[in-house]
Amino acid sequence: MGLLVDGKWQDKWYASDARGRFVRQDSKFRNWVTPDGAPGPTGDGGFKAEPGRYHLYVSSACPWAHRTLIFRALKRLEDVISVSVVHHYLGADGWTFVAEDGATGDTLYGLDYLHQIYTRADPGHSGRVTVPVLWDKKRETIVNNESAEIIRMLNSAFDEWGDATLDFYPQRLREEIDRINALVYPAINNGVYRAGFATSQEAYEEAFRTLFEALDTVEERLSRHRYLVGERLTEADWRLFTTLLRFDPVYVGHFKCNLRRIADYPNLSNYLRDLYQVPGVAGTVNLHHIKTHYYGSHESINPARIVPVGPELDYAAPHDRARFRKAA
């Protein structure tokens, strides 16, 4: 893995502290697209929602970027916000725009590397080069590279052109959604990375315990409700979904998160299939990119870069979640 230092690409970097714990850097670009261009919760104003103005840079392998693809699909914004998909291999040059094997290349500028998008926005940028990136074609800059904020923009800022009937962050449920996110993000979404990229036994076991305690908590919650916040699909579900989808094919083996599979949890496994079968979601899933990225890119974890053939997965199989009543 690498990063930019004063606008120059450095290909050697590893994100662990003195105790061997994986440390995720905060996202640096935190502006918001709003319906009228007024400033959002953070950053500057001037980013008005307009069809055709914004572009997403994503990886089909990345769970954080996958969130944005799901919201783009469900909110019917495919003709409003364009997209470029990076290659699944993350090597010495970071994310690349090699246009093969399901990757699109850089459909805006024809660049070779994602880090060139970052330096196009800020020639002296220092920090990691991550996906997703929400790009403003008009101002030629990065609006935001924090997935949790991008999905909230997609949820409401473009309702004039998308499906305004869907609201995954409704006002009356926000407190509970935020509370669920505060459990799921550190323990599960980031927890698998904390286990997988740990460089000490102590750090690995700490992350491992926290991860499976949180999964047990969510499993119990889903025994009482169809979704994480009652009987209504919300942002909290989609934030968890992208991690659950990758758990059995990647995190169990590659990140050593092997106490139990999602398939071993009755409620979580049925819930995962339920979400996968929401119209529009399956089209955002690329298991080939997911598996080849993790197993092929992380040489420190998998030096031979052999990609497992299994497991057999059928996310389209029937589920039992319809036993819960629907939200009024």
Predicted regions and their residues:
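C-terminal alpha-helical interaction module
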Residues: M1-A328
